Amino acid sequence: MTRENVAHNALRQEGLVKGKDDTWKWGTSFQGSSSSVWETSHLHFRQLRYHETSGPQEALSRLRELCRRWLRPEARTKAQILELLVLEQFLSILPGEIRTWVQLHHPGSGEEAVALVEELQKDLDGPAIQVPVLVKDQDTLQKVVSAPGTTLPPVLPGSHIAAEICPHPPTDLVAFNLQDPQHDSPAPEASALSQEENPRNQLMALMLLTAQPQELVMFEEVSVCFTSEEWACLGPIQRALYWDVMLENYGNVTSLEWETMTENEEVTSKPSSSQRADSHKGTSKRLQGSVPQVLDFEEECEWQVLASQWGNETDERADTVKKVSLCERDKKKRTPPEKQGQKWKELGDSLTFGSAISESLIGTEGKKFYKCDMCCKHFNKISHLINHRRIHTGEKPHKCKECGKGFIQRSSLLMHLRNHSGEKPYKCNECGKAFSQSAYLLNHQRIHTGEKPYKCKECGKGFYRHSGLIIHLRRHSGERPYKCNECGKVFSQNAYLIDHQRLHKGEEPYKCNKCQKAFILKKSLILHQRIHSGEKPYKCDECGKTFAQTTYLIDHQRLHSAENPYKCKECGKVFIRSKSLLLHQRVHTEKKTFGCKKCGKIFSSKSNFIDHKRMHSREKPYKCTECGKAFTQSAYLFDHQRLHNGEKPYECNECGKVFILKKSLILHQRFHTGENLYECKDCGKVFGSNRNLIDHERLHNGEKPYECRECGKTFIMSKSFMVHQKLHTQEKAYKCEDCGKAFSYNSSLLVHRRIHTGEKPFECSECGRAFSSNRNLIEHKRIHSGEKPYECDECGKCFILKKSLIGHQRIHTREKSYKCNDCGKVFSYRSNLIAHQRIHTGEKPYACSECGKGFTYNRNLIEHQRIHSGEKTYECHVCRKVLTSSRNLMVHQRIHTGEKPYKCNECGKDFSQNKNLVVHQRMHTGEKPYECDKCRKSFTSKRNLVGHQRIHTGEKPYGCNDCSKVFRQRKNLTVHQKIHTDEKPCECDVSEKEFSQTSNLHLQQKIHTIEEFSWLQNTNESKIEIQKI
C-alpha cells in the first residue's frame, strides 16, 4: 500500500474524506490517543487543498471542523488556544533538524519547546556525531560510508513529521563515526542504547528514516545543468548555492530507493528476496542517473558527467561529491534482516499521515514540488524556486555591462541587451514592424487581427494582453497596491511607481540625441523625437488630419462623433478628455496643491504651475521656426503657426466663419445660440466669456483691484497692471539690434523690427492698405465699417480706439499724468510726452528713404512719403478733394461743417484744430518755446521757426510745377498755384467778389467793416443834428 493510499484510508476512517460510495458526514471512528488526534487534525487543517472538496461551501465547512478539532475551543481557554498558535509559529521558525528534535518530544507549551531546544544545543556542543544508519547490507554500506570524506545527504524537508510519528527508530541501526571511517560498528544493543541516551543520534537517524517519498522521480527531473560558459559566469557564492541545491536533490532522490509498500496488502514480517528484487529493479530504473546511494544501484549515474561540468573546483563540496559519486555496480540482492520485518510494518503504519506533508516537496504529475519559505508559493522546478527567492533577497546576479542594470534571470539580461544592440529578431508580416521579444510580436499581431481575448466581466471591455485586463480591473475595484515610500502616493501599476520615484531622485535616464533634453519616461522621449522628425503616424479617417500621439487622434475623433464620455458627478458637465474632467473636479473640491513661491499663486494642475513659473523666469522654450517668436507653452506655438500656414480648422456651422482657435469658435457660436452669453446688467452689453464681463463691470462700478505699490496707481485689468509695473522696473529685456531700442515684450520688438524691414503682413481687404501689426489692421477696419465701440460717459462722444477714449476722458478730468522733466510741461498721453522730449533732444528717428528727411513722428513720415508716391487715399465727399491722411481729411471736413471744437478759455475764440488752439494760447501767455539758433529769435509755433530758419539757409523746398518758382513755405506755393488755375474759392458775401487767398478775403471784409462803421457814424451824427433842430 502506498503512502498516499494509507493516508487516504486514515482520513476516511476519520470521516474527513469521502469514499466512492460514501456521502459526506463527520465521522467519529478515529482511533488513537488524544495527542495523535490533535496532531493529525492540525496537519489536515494546514494541508487541506481546495481540489479535494466538491465546492467552496464544503471546503469552508471542512476547515471549520478541522480547526475545531485542532484547537478544541470547548475544552480549552482563550489563553491555551493562543499558546497553541504561538507554539506552532515558534516551531515553524526553527531550523529543520532542531524542529524535528523538538516535535519528537511533543511539547505542550512554548516553555517546554524552549527547554528542549536549549537541551539539544548543549548536546550538539559535544564530541563528533555518530549517525545511526539503517543497514541492509553492512558490507556494501561499509564500502560507501567508509570512503574518505564521505558525507551523508541532507535531510528531506518535512521529515520532522515522520519523526513525530516514529519517536523510536528501529533498533537495528549501526552507528558510524563520520570523522573516523575505520571505527568499528558497535553491537545493535549498544547502538540502540546510545540512541536512547543521545538525542543527536535519534535526530540523525530520523533524517534517514523519515525521508519517505510520495512518488519515485528521476534525478533528471530535479537536476539543474549549466553550460561551461554559464558556469564561468557564476561567482563563488552562486556556485556554493548550486552545490547545496544539487546535494539536496541528491538526498531527495536517494530517499526514493527505499522499497514501497503495495496498495492492498500490508508489509509482511519477512519479505522474500524475490519480492524485494522485483521491487528494487523497478525502483532502480526510476533512479537512473541519480547520485550514489547507500543502497543498491542498477544503472551507472550521470553525476560524474555533472561533476565534470563544474571543472576543477577546490571547494570541499566538490571533493566530497566527486568521491561519493564513484558508483559501483553492485549486483547483489540485499534484504533487510528477518527480525526487522515487524518494525518495518510498524514504521509503515506510523507513516500514514506523513504523505500529506511530503506533498509540499515531491508530488504527483502536475503538482508543484518546491515551496518558498517566505511567501509559501510552490514551484515545480527548483531553478524556478531559486529565481523566485531572489525577489525576496533582492539579488540580481546578472549585470548588464553597458548600463549596469541587474536582472534576476539570465534570459531577462539577454532580452535587455537587445535594447543596446538594437536587435529586433521578431518581425510582423503585416506591417513589417520588428520586436525584441516574441511576446511583444504576439501582442502586436492582435492589433491586426482585432483579437481581444481578455474580457472584463464588469463592463465587457476587451484587451490584447492579460496584464491590461488586470490593470483595468483595478479601476473598478479602486485597488492601488503600489505605494511610494517617500510621499505615500499609491499607484495601480508598478511601472507608474518606478516612474514616480524618479521624480524624487531627479533621475532622467532617457536623453534625446539631437537636443540633449532628458526625460523620465521612455514614451516621453519617443513623443519628443517626433518633434524633430515631424512624424505624425496617426491619421483621422474623417478629415485626414494626422497626429503625433494616438491619444490626440482619439480626442480628435470625438469632435466628429460629438462624444463626451467623461461626465462630472457634481454638476453633470461632460468632457472629451479624462484630464479635463480631473481638472474640472478640482473646482468642486478646491484642491490646489501647487503653490508658487514667488507670488503665492496656487494651481490645481502641475502643468499650469510649470507654465506659470515661466512667467517669472521668462523662459520660452517653444520657438517658431518661421519668425523666431517664442512661447511659454507648446499649445501657443501651434496656434501661432496657423498664422503662417493660414490654417483655420474650426468652422462655424451657422455662418461658415472659420477660426484659428477652438475657444474663438465656441465664443462665436454663443452669439448664434444665445447660450452661455454673459450680459451686463447696467448697459445690456453681452460678452462671450465671464472674464470679459467682469472686466467690463468694473467700468461701471469704478473698481480697480490691481494697485501699483510704487506709485499707488490702480488698474481694472491685471495685464494693464503688469505693463505698468515695467515702467518702474524699467525692465526691457528685448532689444532691437538695428537701433538699440529696448522693449518689455517680444511681440513689441517683432512689430518694431517691421519698421526697419518695411514688412507689412496684415492687409485690409477693403482698400488694400497693409499694416505691420494685426491690431492696427483691426483699428483701420473700423474706419470702413464706421464702428466706434468706445463711448464717453460724460458727453457721449464715440471713438474708434480705446486709447482715444482714455485721452478724451482726461479732457473732462483735466488729468495730465505725464510730465516733462526739462520744461515741466504735462501731457495726457505718454506718446505725446515722448514726442515732446524729442524737441529738447532734437531727435528725429523716422527718416525718409527717398530724400533722407527726418521726422519726429512716424505719421509725419508716412504723410511725407505720399508726396513722393503721389498717393492720396482719403477723399472729401463734399468737394472731392483727396488728402494724404485721415487726420487731414477730418480737419478739411471742418471747413465745410464749420465745426470748431477747440475754444480758448481766455478770449472765447474757437479753432478747428487743437494745435491752432495751443499756438493761440501762447499769445496770451507770451510763451515762445521755439528759438532760432542763428539769430536767437523766438516763435510761438514750430512751423514759424522752420519757416524762419529757411531764411538763413535759403532753402525753398516747395516748387511750382507750372513755372518752376520755389517757395519757403507750402502755403505760399498753394496760393501761387491758384494763379495758374484761376481758382478763387474765397467769395465775399457783401460784394460777391472772389479771391484766391483767405487773407485777401479777410482784407476785403475789413474794408466793408470800416465802410459800414463810417456810414453808421455819419448816420448817427445826422440824427443828432435833426434832434437839435
Curated annotation (Swiss-Prot):
A zinc finger (C2H2-type) spans 370-392, 398-420, 426-448, 454-476, 482-504, 510-532, 538-560, 566-588, 594-616, 622-644, 650-672, 678-700, 706-728, 734-756, 762-784, 790-812, 818-840, 846-868, 874-896, 902-924, 930-952, 958-980. Residues 42-124 form the SCAN box domain. One of its GO terms (molecular function) is zinc ion binding. Keywords: DNA-binding, Metal-binding, Nucleus, Repeat, Transcription, Transcription regulation, Zinc, Zinc-finger. GO terms for cellular component: nucleus. It comes from the Eukaryota. Pfam families: KRAB, SCAN, zf-C2H2. GO terms for biological process: regulation of transcription by RNA polymerase II. Gene3D superfamilies: 6.10.140.140, Classic Zinc Finger, DNA breaking-rejoining enzymes. Its main location: nucleus. Residues 217-289 form the KRAB domain. Residues 262-290 are annotated as: Disordered. It is found in: Nucleus. InterPro entries: C2H2-ZF_domain, KRAB, KRAB_dom_sf, SCAN_dom, SCAN_sf, Znf_C2H2_sf, Znf_C2H2_type. Belongs to the krueppel C2H2-type zinc-finger protein family. May be involved in transcriptional regulation. This is Zinc finger protein 197. It comes from Homo sapiens (Human).
